[in-house]
Amino acid sequence: MIFKHTVEPFGDFEKHTLENEQGDACILTPQYGACLLDLRFKGLSVLDAYKTPEELVENAWAKNIVLFPFPNRLRDGSYTHEGKTYQFDINNGDNAIHGFGKNVPMTVKNVTITDDAATIHCIWQHEGSHKAYPFRFTFGIKMTLQDSAFEVEMSFQNDDNTSIPVGLGWHPYFIMSERVEDIYLQMPESQFIMIDERMLPTGEKEEYHAFDTLTRIGETNLDNGFFITQESKQADVILESERGRLHYWQELGAKKWQFLQVFTPPHRKSIAIEPMTCNIDAFNNQEGLVMLEPNEVLNGKFGVRFS
């Protein structure tokens, strides 16, 4: 199968496209946080896509962005590390949300094309200039397109001379039907993370079985975090509709993607399946938080297959 890589203008940015001859494609903007603009299989878009540069910059619902150095919400936007308190800007109610990686200007390190796949590798180096996270690190993201499949590998290397707290995540919105009500969902064995009125964890978890088997979403509203409890190396989420079957997966294990956020936005046209290496507010509650030593790398993979 023939794969190719092309580059085109996209407003003030460039959009890079990896595609093959059967209509599989991933399209991203490295200069805007390596945000995924669209993902297609056999010509069918399965992502809530960005159609214009203006829509990308508006960034409604944080569609398809990478999340670092923490995913999800941070209580009051503050945390304490090695006796010093740091303050992020408040940008979600009384909390900070999703870190600061969404629009950083990444560099394309390399593009690799083979008979079986196309991969683009983007990186961004932080020299410690962020007031709330004054640590040096290198973030990397590899996106690989294969035959009816797409894989992401994130990496975060501590370039500083002290240990630093790290959490990673991704925020894709999938579209599998005109209405989310008509999608069938199956989730991995997991616990429901109980939250308070500020959408922050209470410290309690409950067993969750609503989508143990393929079940129509219907009128269910979801904006919930889950701790994946199954003992295996991979967790799987299935989305099925008249358009086909989307099989999402994420690596499990120590320092991998043991948490998952599932969100159905109010417009009810898509569903977000969000891998996280740590819990909501992990900089404060420490759940799943990785303290990365100098030169240590946190990495992990997730992806989708379509049939």
Residue ranges and their predicted role:
Residues 1-86, 90, 232-254, 298-306:
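Beta-strand-rich N-terminal accessory domains
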Residues 2, 86-88, 163-165, 173-250:
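Active-site/ligand-binding surface loops and adjacent short beta/alpha elements
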Residues 2-10, 89-146:
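Extended, loop-rich substrate-binding clefts of extracytoplasmic carbohydrate-active enzymes
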Residues 30, 128-166, 170-172, 177:
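Acidic, contiguous internal or C-terminal segments within carbohydrate-active enzymes
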Residues 80-84, 109-120, 144-149, 177-182, ...:
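A short, structured loop/turn motif at beta-sheet edges
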Residues 96-111, 216-288:
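Acidic/His-leaning functional-site neighborhoods
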Residues 141, 149-151, 296-307:
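C-terminal or internal capping secondary-structure element at the end of a domain, subdomain, or sheet
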Residues 288-297:
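Intrinsically disordered, low-complexity Pro/Gly/Ser/Thr-rich segments with frequent PxxP/GP/PP motifs
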